[in-house]
Regions:
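Charge-rich, low-complexity N-terminal segments
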Residues: 3-95
Length: 95
């Protein structure tokens, strides 16, 4: 059996909603977003997504849901996870 694996490049956009903190002027500090995202990015970057637990069928929709579920506890105010495969093709996920 011949198996040809191919790679994809995705743009992941995370949207956070909430009140603006009067002391900082932020809804969320982008460094906090980066820290929450970094372990997931490291886990997903240049890997075979089918081998990632929970991503055995790594459609864009299921990838967005997987990211949401992985981030919701560490990123308060998470409102939307977007996965873009191209400039005009992508999905958005929220709960």
């Amino acid at each position: 059996m011949l198996f040809r694996s191919h790679g994809h490049t995705f743009l992941v956009r995370l949207t956070v909603r909430g009140p603006i903190d009067p002391a900082t002027g932020f809804v969320v500090d982008f460094d906090d977003v980066r820290r929450a995202w970094a372990p997931l990015h490291e886990q997903l970057d240049h890997c075979y997504l089918n081998a990632v637990p929970g991503l055995e069928n790594p459609t864009s929709e299921l990838l967005a849901q997987w990211i949401w579920r992985a981030l919701q506890a560490t990123l308060p105010g998470l409102a939307l996870v977007e996965i873009r495969e191209t400039g005009n093709a992508g999905v958005a996920y929220r709960e």
